[in-house]
Amino acid sequence: MEKMINDIAHRIIAGGSITEAEAIQLTQVQGTEVYDLFRAATRVKEHFVGNEVHLCSIINAKSGRCAENCAFCAQSAHHKTDAPVYPLVQEEEMLASARMAETNGSACFGIITSGTTVNGPELEQILTALRRIRKETTILPSCSLGIIDEETARKLKEAGMDTYHHNLETAASFFPQICTTHDYQDDVNTVRAVKKAGVKVCCGGIFGLGESAAQRVEMALTLKDLDVDSVPMNFLNPIEGTRLEGAANITAQECLKTIAIYRLILPGKRITVCGGREKNLRDLQSWIFFAGANGTMIGNYLTTLGRNVDTDLTMFSDLGLKTVMCAH
C-alpha cells in the first residue's frame, strides 16, 4: 500500500490524477498506512498550494425558520432545537463582524443567511453591507444566501462579493436521505450560475451524516467536475432536536483520512476545515494541516461555538504556518 500511495502522489505532482477506484481503496487504509496517506497528501499540498493557511470567519446574519428539511440542521423549521431565531441583522452589525474578523487575521468574511434564498429588501440590505465592507475594510467578503441565479450572482459581485459559498452537503446518491425539500440539481445549478457570473465558488459538504466512504469520494469527484475554487469540509456535530441528533460521531482518524483523500482528488484547491473541528478532532486539530488542509474557519460557527481565536492563532504559529493576509 505504501508504494501505491507514493505512486499516486508522484502521478498527481506530475500532472496526473487519482482514479475513483484508487480513492475508494485509500478510504480503507489502517495502521501505519494512514501516515503514508498523510505524507502523500502533505507533499501534494505543498507542491500545489504551498505552506500557507487561509483563515475565514462568518456571521450568522439571519437565523432559523428555514423551510428546508436538511437532517443535520439546527435552523430547519422541521426541527425543534434551541438554535436562535432572528431576521436579517442590520448592515452595521455585518460591518462590525467583518472588522472583528479582519482584526483576528481572517482573509475572508462570510455573510450567511438561513432559508432557501434571499430577494427583495433583504438582498438590497446585503448589497449595501457588501459595499461598505469593501470600502471600509480590507477583508474579502463572501456570501451564502442559498439557491440563487446568475443575475443575483452578478449583483452581489458588483457590490463587492469576492466568493459565493454554496455547499452540496453530500453525494448525489445520498442526498435524498438528507434533504427532500429541494433537488441536488438545484445546488449544482447554483454553483454553475455563480461560476458563469464570474464569481469564485466555495463549495463542499458535511461528513458523518451516514454516508459511505465511497459516497465521500463521489462528492469529491463532483466538486472536481464543477471546478470549484475552495472546498469547506465540515464534520457533523449532532444537535439535539434534529433528525441526526443520535448519529455516531465520525472518528478523528476518519476526518483526517477524508481530508487527505480530498487533497489527492482536488490537489490545487483550497481545502478549509470548518464546523465540527473541535468536536470531532479534539487534540488532533493541528493534524488537519498534515493531512492536506490549507485553511480553517476561526471564531464561531452558525449555531455552535468555535475554539478561542487566540488558541488557534497560537497553533498556526507553533506549526510554522504563515497565514494569508487580507487583500482586495
UniProtKB/Swiss-Prot annotation:
Gene3D superfamilies: Aldolase class I
EC number: 2.8.1.6
Transferase is among the record's keywords: yes
InterPro entries reported in the protein's UniProt record: Aldolase_TIM, BATS_dom, Biotin_synth/BioAB, Biotin_synthase, Elp3/MiaA/NifB-like_rSAM, rSAM
Pathway where it operates: Cofactor biosynthesis; biotin biosynthesis; biotin from 7,8-diaminononanoate: step 2/2
One GO BP annotation of this record: biotin biosynthetic process
Binding-site list for [2Fe-2S] cluster: 142, 202
Reactions it catalyzes: (4R,5S)-dethiobiotin + (sulfur carrier)-SH + 2 reduced [2Fe-2S]-[ferredoxin] + 2 S-adenosyl-L-methionine = (sulfur carrier)-H + biotin + 2 5'-deoxyadenosine + 2 L-methionine + 2 oxidized [2Fe-2S]-[ferredoxin]
Cofactor note: Binds 1 [4Fe-4S] cluster. The cluster is coordinated with 3 cysteines and an exchangeable S-adenosyl-L-methionine.
Keywords, comma-separated and alphabetical: 2Fe-2S, 4Fe-4S, Biotin biosynthesis, Iron, Iron-sulfur, Metal-binding, S-adenosyl-L-methionine, Transferase
A Pfam family the protein falls into: BATS
Binding site for [4Fe-4S] cluster: 66, 70, 73
Cofactor(s) required for function per UniProt: [4Fe-4S] cluster; [2Fe-2S] cluster
Family membership noted in the UniProt record: Belongs to the radical SAM superfamily. Biotin synthase family.
Subunit description: Homodimer.
Function: Catalyzes the conversion of dethiobiotin (DTB) to biotin by the insertion of a sulfur atom into dethiobiotin via a radical-based mechanism.
Protein name as annotated: Biotin synthase
Organism field: Citrifermentans bemidjiense (strain ATCC BAA-1014 / DSM 16622 / JCM 12645 / Bem)
